[in-house]
Amino acid sequence: MPSYALLGATGATGSSVLRHLLYSGSSSDLTVNVLVRSKSKLLAAFPSLDKPRPSVTSSIPTIRIFEGDSTNPDVLCAVLQDASLVFMCVAQNGSPMGTTLVQNTAAALIEARRRQAQPRGELTVIQLRSASLNPVLAVQVPRFVHRVVCFCLAAGYADLRRACVLYEAAATEGLLQYVLVDPPTLHDARGTQTTGYRLIDTTDMKDKENQRQAICLSYADLGVAMCEIASRADELHGQGVGVTATGPVRQTWAVLAGFLLEGGLGHLDYRYGRENVVVLGVCILLLLGGLLYSIKA
């Protein structure tokens, strides 16, 4: 009987993964160990998890809920018990300077693997990353836009990079395998309707046409894509796999703009100091005001 672990199941990505595992109808013999910080929040989003499993012949997988911190190796030892694959969907909104959540979770997971009794079964980590960190996909975005996004989300991207370095070292050590999932901008966090997606092989340098990535993808389609990647993990080990939409996406740019603005201001504050940032902002506003006044005059 296959067994998965899912970290971060109450977030937009984790909940879309869990929703597909629960309702796709192809997971009857699957056990999923779900780690969340708040069990009550998970049950509010998925009330059916609080009810007895219908029957032995049900197509719904067996769900085991663990409550705790994803950076605690003791908790992860229990969550990883018998698991052959981990969906790493731990994340936080925005990009606060100094964030280390993803790399700390990776370090705790690797420590938990070291503590597991020998012989260990093989474990594959499906780590959500970003197209901005995949050279093949990032080059498709205008350079100025890419640089602005990387500046605004610098802290979150640095956290992801460090986590990936830890996974690479752990794979070399033989503790685990990993696959990196690189979506474009993600939209419609509360949506559940899928409209279609396609995986992108970023290792085939001759197939440029099929490496093209749309700029938007829904969380719902990302969840299904991550489940497909899980089913094909053996052929994708060590790769960065792109995901692109093939259908319409309900776009929520206002939410993303808020995250970019918050991250950008935080990065400016960190590099130049809040007072200097405020002075610069006032100067820009005065300059714009002067230009508008001169145009009207």
Curated annotation (Swiss-Prot):
GO term, biological process aspect, one: sterigmatocystin biosynthetic process
Pfam families: NAD_binding_10 (PF13460)
Compartments it resides in: Membrane
Gene3D superfamilies named in the record: NAD(P)-binding Rossmann-like Domain
Main EC class the enzyme belongs to: oxidoreductase
Membrane topology reported for the UniProt record: Single-pass membrane protein
Induction, per UniProt: The genes forming the sterigmatocystin biosynthesis cluster are co-regulated and induced on oatmeal porridge or the fungal isolates were grown either on oatmeal porridge or in YEC medium (0.2% yeast extract, 5.0% corn steep liquor). Expression is positively regulated by the cluster-specific transcription factor aflR that binds the palindromic sequence 5'-TCG(N5)CGA-3'found in the promoter.
First and last residue of the signal peptide: none
Known pathway: Mycotoxin biosynthesis; sterigmatocystin biosynthesis
E.C. number: 1.-.-.-
Primary residence: membrane
Record's protein name: Averufin oxidase stcO
Lineage per the UniProt record: Eukaryota, Fungi, Dikarya, Ascomycota, Pezizomycotina
